């Protein structure tokens, strides 16, 4: 079952800040992951950020699954993504 990718405003802002080659790499990975998201995802221990994460090199995508949608909550470098703001 293919899942639909939905981006929160925060995730859209996070992506906008990235360099174009990083955006491309993350976009391609998300399309690939949308086929079977739980196969590639890890459950987060702190559900305040979100339920799951994808690892894409040094970048992390924090997301929830709602029905047949992958709701992308945050996108960022691993050194920054888990910091609370």
Model-derived regions, located:
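A short, surface-exposed loop/turn module that caps and links secondary-structure elements
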Residues: 30-54
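Enriched for short, Lys/Arg-rich terminal
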Residues: 2-13, 17-24, 56-59, 64-85
